[in-house]
């Protein structure tokens, strides 16, 4: 038998073995939870007299809830969604990412990363 034949036989045996997959429990954010977070952020903005654009996303960065309060510039909508998406996907605040860039970590200067303060991961 050739080395190739032995290798194929070993590979076939390995592929037929049962796999013990490890699983993790992931908490899903539903619409009710997203609205609760949105309202809490809105209340905080009102207390600080700082109208805001507020976005809540799931762990993949997909939008679940959004509100642009009166007096907020239209461009803030895209910024808020980008900050939320970045914080969710990287599981760190966008302030931390902005600080990393300011310290020279240019790897964070890529498409689809919004490195402006204001995004917080939901934990």
What are these regions (language model features)?
Residues 21-123:
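Flexible, solvent-exposed loop/hinge segments and secondary-structure transition points
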Residues 5-18:
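Bacterial N-terminal signal peptides
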């Amino acid at each position: 038998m050739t080395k190739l034949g032995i290798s194929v036989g070993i590979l076939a045996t390995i592929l037929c073995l049962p796999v013990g997959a490890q699983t993790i429990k992931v908490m899903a954010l539903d619409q009710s939870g997203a609205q609760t977070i949105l309202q809490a952020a809105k209340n905080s903005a009102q207390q600080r007299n700082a109208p805001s654009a507020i976005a809540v996303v799931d762990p993949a960065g997909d939008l679940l809830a959004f509100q642009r309060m009166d007096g907020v510039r239209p461009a803030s909508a895209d910024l808020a969604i980008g900050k939320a998406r970045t914080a969710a996907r990287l599981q760190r605040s966008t302030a931390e990412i902005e600080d990393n860039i300011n310290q020279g970590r240019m790897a964070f200067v890529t498409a689809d990363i919004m490195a402006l303060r204001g995004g917080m991961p939901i934990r």
